[in-house]
């Protein structure tokens, strides 16, 4: 009779989990941030709040975000006027949008990843889906399984309400799935639509303005598996190690509350300082075994959480300005897309390196880090090893 240990050994893989393909998608509606303040105050019937509008414009200028993509169009808002009324009961209207559109946008990103991967969908064994909104039964994982026509035996994992650190979480979990299940190929999807957090401006709730200035919609997907078949698969990044940590006593610094008005988001002014002061502890934890302590010797896939956060992390760690260039570029072109953000940055980084002819997928460097952070205050840290091109 076969022993339990023999069964376990047969299930495990020898090599590290590897990203085999990346795909992204955005809504068609592109918003120019130079005109968005006027649009936002007009559609919410708030043009009379002139001082608040000027404050909003200054927020945009400081954010360095040039454009973003939003599912909500003026037509959709006219069809759902309660969404534009300050603190009006509107959860049902918002929910009806996101439970349909979050899986649909995720499908686009997943199809792009599957196309790049070049293998039949029947080889997908696991599905990991992450979104901040649209909690429902059946969940977005079920909806995406049906939309893509995946096998009914695909093993699904659904994660809601993680917020901005979710992109790191899905990679950490997919790493464990790939390395502990022989032949596993995990389809990972992060899809975010801000319809649930769109609120009319208010003098007493400036967090609304911060959210409108920072956030955009987008979806990203990766295929992850161990021991790639090099005849038909092209490995991009190996997931070497992963860690998650909570910054003590910071649960009130970033949080959201779901109610009949939708999801209200709160971001404390101390967040940039707290992230910058605590991120190095996470870096040391994952890079010490590799003997790496020079943070300029690695490539950076950072969460595009906002200009102030990036500025303070750069200053605290003594990073060269170019280390966060790709993260800043993604932020300027898409805004903060919550869990999908770091995967957009990873995709942009490997594309840039390919164009510039580097020997690896990122800046010619071998080692790198992916960092995401969000409610909790939670920090996810992934050590990446770039595969030679």
UniProtKB/Swiss-Prot annotation:
Q: In which tissues is it expressed?
A: CHSF does not appear to be pseudogene, but expression of this gene could not be detected in various floral tissues nor in seedlings after illumination with UV light.
- Report the top EC class in one word: transferase
According to UniProt, the reaction catalysed is: (E)-4-coumaroyl-CoA + 3 malonyl-CoA + 3 H(+) = 2',4,4',6'-tetrahydroxychalcone + 3 CO2 + 4 CoA
Question: Which regions form coiled coils?
Answer: none
UniProt record, GO biological process: flavonoid biosynthetic process; polyketide biosynthetic process
GO MF, any single term:
naringenin-chalcone synthase activity
The UniProt entry, under InterPro entries, shows: Chalcone/stilbene_synt_C, Chalcone/stilbene_synt_N, Chalcone/stilbene_synthase_AS, Polyketide_synthase_type-III, Thiolase-like
Keywords, ordered alphabetically: Acyltransferase, Flavonoid biosynthesis, Transferase
| Similarity section | Belongs to the thiolase-like superfamily. Chalcone/stilbene synthases family.
Q: What is this protein called?
A: Chalcone synthase F
Q: Which organism is it from?
A: Petunia hybrida
């Amino acid at each position: 009779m076969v022993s339990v240990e023999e069964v376990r050994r047969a299930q495990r893989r020898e090599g590290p989990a590897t990203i085999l393909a990346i795909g992204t998608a955005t809504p068609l509606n592109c918003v120019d941030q130079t005109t968005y303040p006027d649009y936002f105050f007009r559609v919410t019937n708030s043009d009379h709040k002139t001082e608040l509008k000027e404050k909003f414009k200054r927020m945009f200028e400081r954010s360095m975000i040039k454009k973003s993509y939003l599912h909500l169009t003026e037509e959709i808002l006219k069809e759902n006027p309660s969404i534009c009324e300050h603190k009006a009961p509107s959860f049902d209207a918002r929910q009806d949008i996101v439970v349909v559109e979050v899986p649909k946008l995720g499908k686009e990103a997943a199809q792009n990843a599957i196309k790049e991967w070049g293998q039949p969908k029947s080889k997908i064994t696991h599905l990991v889906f992450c979104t901040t909104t649209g909690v429902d039964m059946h969940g977005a994982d079920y909806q995406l399984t049906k939309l893509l026509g995946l096998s009914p035996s695909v093993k699904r994992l659904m994660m809601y309400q993680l917020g901005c650190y979710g992109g790191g979480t899905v990679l950490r979990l997919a790493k464990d799935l790939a390395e502990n299940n022989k032949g596993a190929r995990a389809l990972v999807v992060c899809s975010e639509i801000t319809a649930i957090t769109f609120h009319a401006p208010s003098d007493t709730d400036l967090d609304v303005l911060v959210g409108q200035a920072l956030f955009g919609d987008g979806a990203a997907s990766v295929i992850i598996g161990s021991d790639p078949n090099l005849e038909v698969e092209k490995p991009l990044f190996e997931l070497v190690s992963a860690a998650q940590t909570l910054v003590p006593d910071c649960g009130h610094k970033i949080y959201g509350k779901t109610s009949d008005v939708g999801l209200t988001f709160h971001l404390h002014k101390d967040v940039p300082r707290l992230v910058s002061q605590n991120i190095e502890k996470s870096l040391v934890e994952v890079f010490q075994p590799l003997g790496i302590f020079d943070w300029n010797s690695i490539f950076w896939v950072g969460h595009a959480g906002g200009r102030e956060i990036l500025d303070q992390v750069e200053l605290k760690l003594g990073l060269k300005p170019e280390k966060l260039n790709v993260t800043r570029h993604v932020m300027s072109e898409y805004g903060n897309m919550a869990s999908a953000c770091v995967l957009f940055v990873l995709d942009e980084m490997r594309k840039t390196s390919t164009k510039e002819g580097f020997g690896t997928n990122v800046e010619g460097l071998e080692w790198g880090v992916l960092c995401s952070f969000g409610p909790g205050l939670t920090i996810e840290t992934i050590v990446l090893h770039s595969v030679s091109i």
